[in-house]
Amino acid sequence: DKSFYFSSARNTIRKNYGWNEEPFLDVYTAEIIGGTVKNANLIIGDINTKYHEGNVAITADGKRMYFDRNDYYQGKYKKSEEGISQIHLFSAVKENGVWKDIQPVNFNNSEYSVGQPALSPDGNTLYFVSDMPGGKGMSDIYKVSINKDGTLGKPESLGDDINTEGKEVFPFVDANGTLYFSSDGHMGMGDLDVFYAEANGGVFLGVRNIGTDINSSGDDFAFKYDPNIKEGYVSSNRKGGVGSDDIYAIKLIAPLCDFELIVQVVDEITKLPLADARVDLFDNFEN
């Protein structure tokens, strides 16, 4: 059996968040029993506050967590000069089943957001999302080395192959080292789509859309995948869901692959090929 961590606004007794009039997010944990997620409860410890707590990444030994929350630490709630409480990254350690010793990362800043953590398979690199100055788009994906003493190095952008002028969010690196993320800047099927890029010499190259049925005409994000069992999860606000955003279980039934589409345009009468003809290709969602 395994643990399943997720964030939810299901606690309706909580104060509503002004931007969407839903309760603030909390982190929950559940059990995966026989392929089914059961027994969801608030995470035990000092993670959750009266503000937003969202994405988590946990080391392989289960002893350290990286998570994001509003700019709230040691009872102090801070805002930027524009009056916005940014999202910040924190770490916590697990002792006797309880998450405690909350510490902010060294590159948090009240003027921009830093969040959505993910870890490399070897646990030596932390990936995150930020709109810090110097980025290419609305939000970019960065990486930072994790030193042996637990301190973090200097953030480094994943570069122009990954980041666009739009939003790149929710990074995840699977056991094979493949990076998955969501973007509205790469060519997709809807709003946020899930993309992937394989590691090559320390960098990620060859961004590809993961395709349907993972992606929809809405927002698809927070993709998690275990290549050993070929199963995972994705969050989406696609039509047919129960709430604003829902979590869906996925299973790989065919290998991801590229294909070459060869199209020839001919004259309707002569049937001879037409040079420099424009071809528009649409999917089932009219994209």
Enumerate the language-model features and the residues they cover.
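Short, conserved micro-motifs composed of acidic
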Residues: D1-Q264, E268-T270, L274, R278, ...
